Amino acid sequence: MTVMNHRHKQCHFLLLLLITVFSAALDGVSSETDVGGFDYGEALSKSLLYFEAQRSGRLPYNQRVTWRDHSGLTDGLEQGVDLVGGYHDAGDHVKFGLPMAFTVTMLSWSVIEYGDSLASTGELSHALEAIKWGTDYFIKAHTSPNVLWAEVGDGDTDHYCWQRPEDMTTSRRAFKIDENNPGSDIAGETAAAMAAASIVFRSTNPHYSHLLLHHAQQLFEFGDKYRGKYDESLKVVKSYYASVSGYMDELLWGATWLYRATDNEHYMSYVVDMAHQLGGLSWAMSEFSWDVKFAGVQLLASMLLKEEKHKQHSKVLQQYKSKADHYLCSILNKNINGTNVQRTPAGLLYVRQWNNMQYVSTASFLLTVYSDHLRKSNTDLECHEGTVTPDEMLGFAKSQIDYILGSNPMETSYLVGYGPKYPIRVHHRGASIASFKEHKGFIGCTQGYDNWYGRSEPNPSVLVGALVGGPDHQDDFDDRRGNYVQTEACTYNTAPLVGVFARLIELEEQKLEEEDVSLVATYKR
């Protein structure tokens, strides 16, 4: 760089700085307030940190959540298989395969859509680590083409105890699906997770990407050939993660992601030819979750319409689009006949009482992704009650995120560790008991209930980045450890936020660039 160019850049920077300071002084507000008032970069960083707190297994040297230690090091030993690793789903220590796989799918989708934004913030490596921690476990759990270990631990015995994961004395028995005990739902979701992750690692780790794709294809074939609900084969899961929607949505979901990962017409034909039989065109949804994937399938399928090579499938894809539009319009309060999603008085989407925030985060993600799709296509969303522009869709998603971060009647951030006020008694065994690093003495099964569970004091460790269940239908929130309906957090709550935060960071940067250009133009005049 020449001295002249260097001085020119310095002068330009000082000019912009002076204009920005002068403008902010006139307005009486900070530039942060101008673009929304929330630090989405901080929220993104903290959301990714949460997954490190949920890790099971031997923790790596670069573990950032230092109040955790190794746990579950004999998982699978009883069955003669290595099942060390993976994630605890929430505030307990069972490793439930179905919600874990959905978590990884959503993390991968976030990176696929907003990887550049994640890279610009320095968080891409953490996102990749979060995904790989899950997919490494899935590789272990898929021990042969038609066998998938679906769960480690028993929810009943696990919930009887209140212990740190480092002290676990509960059963670590593992449960599998196979040809005689099918589980098309968990096989399909795990296939989706590994297919989506294969896209993520395609350029940076092609060998690993190929390995993931191989497992994904085998799992999908297994799930499709030997059909059945996993909670019918494994009764132990029924009280915790029952597959209420069945397995049809997961088969379509897995095929859709395999098509995105391979561009193989076989999977495209499956999504089209099986659309009616598997309910893809009959179910008009108002939720998207670890159990119900139809809205995700419908949205992904509708996005294929813009590609000329899918012209032969346009009739079925258009039907998928109609169902995707129904979901989006229901979220935006633009449907008729009472099919809109309920909202709290302050405007939060409200699907059901237990862990409602999971539906808010997934809805915000789908709105965000589809708004970008419509913007690129230069089209709007057509609903029964009017047209919605891409900017309006993204704006509503942002309103939900801002509610989560503190713009709500309780003035509470429901993302733990973000902002001046957030839940301090999260329903989480590890965080609610003194850290193993500071208190190495063994804490027994019921000792945790006796000495820690009922305390009114804040948790000794902050579960940074966890999205708790959230407020009730009146925007009220009771921060008690025993109020697990509202204060328990889950990995699949936070995972979709990663993509939305990344997109909102882009939005902020765009606004700042536009303001800079406008201010410079005004100054020159």
Curated annotation (Swiss-Prot):
Residues making up the signal peptide according to the UniProt record: 1-31
Claim: Signal is one of the keywords in the record: yes
Gene Ontology biological process terms in this record: cell wall organization; cellulose catabolic process
InterPro entries membership: 6-hairpin_glycosidase_sf, 6hp_glycosidase-like_sf, Glyco_hydro_9, Glyco_hydro_9_His_AS
EC number: 3.2.1.4
UniProt-annotated location(s): Secreted
Source organism superkingdom: Eukaryota
Residue numbers annotated as active site: D92, H427, D479, E488
Glycosylated position list: N337
Pfam family membership, one: Glyco_hydro_9
Keywords: Carbohydrate metabolism, Cell wall biogenesis/degradation, Cellulose degradation, Glycoprotein, Glycosidase, Hydrolase, Polysaccharide degradation, Secreted, Signal
GO terms of molecular function: cellulase activity
Primary subcellular site in the record, as a coarse category: secreted
Gene3D superfamilies cross-referenced by the UniProt entry: 1.50.10.10
Record's GO cellular component terms: extracellular region
Keyword Cell wall biogenesis/degradation: yes
Catalytic reaction(s) noted: Endohydrolysis of (1->4)-beta-D-glucosidic linkages in cellulose, lichenin and cereal beta-D-glucans
Similarity comment: family membership: Belongs to the glycosyl hydrolase 9 (cellulase E) family.
Protein name, per record: Endoglucanase 11
Organism: Arabidopsis thaliana (Mouse-ear cress)
